[in-house]
Amino acid sequence: MQTLELLAPAKNLECGIAAIDHGADAVYIGAPRFGARAAAGNSLEDIRQLCDYAHQFGAKVHVTVNTIIYQDEMLDTLKMIQQLDEIGVDALLLQDMGVLTEVRAQNLWSRELHSSTQCDVRTPEKAYWLTTLGFKRIVLARELSLDEIKAIHQAIPDREIEVFVHGALCVSYSGVCYASEKCFGRSANRGECAQFCRMKFDLLDSNGQEIEHQRYLLSLKDLCQLDHLKDLADAGATSFKIEGRLKDINYVKNVVAAYSSQLDAIVKAEPRKYRRASVGHVQYNFTPNLKKTFNRGFTHYFLNGRQPDIASFDTPKAIGEFVGKVKEIRGNISFNVATVASFKNGDGLCFINDDRELEGFRVNRVEGNRLYPFGMPEHMRPGMALYRNNDRAFEALLARKSAERKIYIVIEMEPVMGNKFREEPQGVKAVVNIMKTKEADGGLIYQVAEVFKELKLEKAKRPQGENIKAQMSKLGDTIYEAYQVELLKGMETYFVPNSILTAIRRELIDELTKANQKQLDKSLWGGWDRTLFNNGFGFSQPGEHRLTKEEFTWQPEYGKWGYLYNIANYDARVFYQIHGLSPVVPAFELGKNIPSAWNAKTQEEYDENIEKNKANRSMQPKFTNERGESLLMQCRHCIRYSLGYCVKRGGKKPSWREPLFLQLGDGRRFRLEFACNECQMNLYSEK
């Protein structure tokens, strides 16, 4: 049976709890430091509370420590990881191989390790190599197709595969984007991305002739694979990840609810093939609608091969749902909309004007299809498409208690008879069973706890079945809901005072909670001794799985640009040397003026030169080719294809000459290279 996990983002404790309540099987949250979203750090205490809450439902908490780590940060990083292990975190996401080396060598982590999407996994070979290093789960690049995902699954059939299914898309393969660091001194590999890909560019040819003027040529639509979850599961994916660790709580509620409902439908259709990774059913107080939550328009990206409409060239902002067209404008006061949608005071609307710019405004008053904005938009024209990017009524629904998650239980009660010399009942036995799902087929009912209450039972004057069931179903504010109360062996014929029934119910729930915690403790440790983690869990020893230079060249660019391996500390340098990489080049963030620390032969010598290393990090990176350029991005998105000029795929022949350049408003230019054999677009900085 295949387990399906919905993995949701948690900006903070509140968002994490909301994700669990709305159906997530796991959440991922930023560590106090060193996560790939520097603005999304959380305290250890908040993470501990989130673990306690999630574990009640068998849900998991993953913590991201997925940046590259400088040597002077290593001790703090390892100490934090050990603390995360102690508070019950279920999985750790890593990018830095130096951190991996120390975690394994010092036995600092007792549970799952996941390779971050920052590891840039595009091929079966790289996925397999990472599993030999100790990673139980591989997070794949967002750009992969179903066939590519299937090929990776076939290479690592006994390991978990995590795929992104919803949210913002990075235009470059994750982990190998250096544009933000180059242009603004803010490294994406350090969680400080400056959103270079959401900026305006001119597109110029080799003669400086303008092809496109001030458009968002690197800005992609948002990913949405809601209708392809089963396809992904059939390809081998087991975890479905929602992007958005900086998104607000209403975003989390709506998106998680939509995807959880879809996964439930898949499980219900084939209960003997699929099951959810956690327990509990959710009652929603709203109907999920992805169009009503922040989005730039949706795309399936490359799931079924290259598609023409993946970019959002007009705006990087949220557009929202289409609600109609402007029909008629009355001066500077109001306008009429041709629509079947209804509006509320305070709705946020927007449109793309004649200059292909997004304009937005707030509705002040509504009279049917006639809207009175706070200020009439200057560039609105009849016939323009209108979008709603803030639905006040929907947001109000989400602001209230919008869902409740409960675990179905089945309670069985029966009288306990005496021995053959004493036929009268000696008390009541109550047993509680947890249901994985409420469907009869594949419901996975299993016994959890039981209670015996010794008391003298007397026959009731009238049937007690309804009263006993009602009393035992009063589970109040607990996380449990009585799906069924079964009375066995004539239990309904005996009288039991309500006070006794209440006591039995409370004791039963207490025992259930204890049993769940005991089972949780066992599952968290996974049944292995932590000393086995380093050398007995099927992972290679340091240097055991050496690669040749050709094997280390995951893509052609890796053979030309050594900084793509993101080696930022002494441990990572030694790791790659032991595993056969040569030459070993420091991370882009360290710059080409290699500090003496980088050339150290021992860690002690390295540590002595840390201050020089710090000083070097303040300098501009200087890794360049013979043209004085640096490779900043590798993209499957292709501007030439999106504009209709890909001759390989039937596009028109361009009238301009290559190379093409993207140019920022301040004059900085970036050369585009179209690597058609790889079907990839690379972006280079100029001198």
Can you say where each PLM-predicted feature lies in the sequence?
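Surface-exposed amphipathic alpha-helical tracts and adjacent flexible/coil segments at the periphery
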Residues: 1-22, 26-36, 46, 50-51, ...
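An active-site metal/cofactor-coordinating segment within enzyme catalytic domains
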Residues: 39-43
